[in-house]
From Swiss-Prot:
<dbReference type="GO" id="GO:0005344">
    <property type="term" value="F:oxygen carrier activity"/>
</dbReference>
<dbReference type="GO" id="GO:0072562">
    <property type="term" value="C:blood microparticle"/>
</dbReference>
<keyword id="KW-0813">Transport</keyword>
<feature type="binding site" description="proximal binding residue">
    <location>
        <position position="87"/>
    </location>
    <ligand>
        <name>heme b</name>
    </ligand>
</feature>
<keyword id="KW-0479">Metal-binding</keyword>
<dbReference type="GO" id="GO:0042744">
    <property type="term" value="P:hydrogen peroxide catabolic process"/>
</dbReference>
<feature type="binding site">
    <location>
        <position position="58"/>
    </location>
    <ligand>
        <name>O2</name>
    </ligand>
</feature>
<dbReference type="InterPro" id="IPR012292">
    <property type="entry name" value="Globin/Proto"/>
</dbReference>
<dbReference type="Pfam" id="PF00042">
    <property type="entry name" value="Globin"/>
</dbReference>
<dbReference type="InterPro" id="IPR000971">
    <property type="entry name" value="Globin"/>
</dbReference>
<comment type="similarity">
    <text>Belongs to the globin family.</text>
</comment>
<dbReference type="GO" id="GO:0005506">
    <property type="term" value="F:iron ion binding"/>
</dbReference>
<dbReference type="GO" id="GO:0019825">
    <property type="term" value="F:oxygen binding"/>
</dbReference>
<dbReference type="InterPro" id="IPR050056">
    <property type="entry name" value="Hemoglobin_oxygen_transport"/>
</dbReference>
<dbReference type="GO" id="GO:0004601">
    <property type="term" value="F:peroxidase activity"/>
</dbReference>
<dbReference type="GO" id="GO:0031838">
    <property type="term" value="C:haptoglobin-hemoglobin complex"/>
</dbReference>
<protein>
    <recommendedName>
        <fullName>Hemoglobin subunit alpha-A</fullName>
    </recommendedName>
</protein>
Length: 141
């Protein structure tokens, strides 16, 4: 459960991300595909090479979903319900991949905002990403 302080921390770090979200999304996917190559299996139709247009486009979607969750931080499940349905019923993505993606996003944020990612903010962002992961995997049951 996200505390009031967690919500403030998450909103604050996303404010710092600002207009860099699309780049961070692509960087997150690139990192995930490099560190966890098994995740590429869900993207057989993608050019998963560094900097590809498809990676950039999907990275933009990933960050847009995270921003949607931040904007509805008190109802993440409602905000991401359709996305949860898509991943559970149509795409059938292994639920473990959401946690891998979240960890890669944390690394990217840390690279670009090291001074802002204090231990408290890091913990809050991790809790938020875990909450998003939980929502996205809830409909697998």
């Amino acid at each position: 459960v996200l505390s009031a302080a967690d919500k403030t921390n998450v909103k604050g770090i996303f404010a710092k991300i600002g207009g860099h979200g699309d780049d961070y999304g692509a960087e997150t996917l690139d990192r995930m595909f490099t560190v966890y190559p098994q995740t590429k299996t869900y993207f057989p139709h993608f050019d998963v090479s560094h900097g590809s247009a498809q990676i950039k486009a999907h990275g933009k979607k990933v960050v847009a979903a995270l921003v949607e969750a931040v904007n509805h931080i008190d109802d993440i499940a409602g905000a991401l319900s359709k996305l949860s349905d898509l991943h559970a019923h149509k795409l059938r993505v292994d639920p473990a991949n959401f946690k891998l993606l979240g960890q890669c996003f944390l690394v990217v944020v840390g690279i670009h905002h090291a001074s802002a990612l204090t231990p408290e903010v890091h913990a809050s962002l991790d809790k938020f990403l875990c909450a998003v992961s939980t929502v996205l995997t809830a409909k697998y049951r």
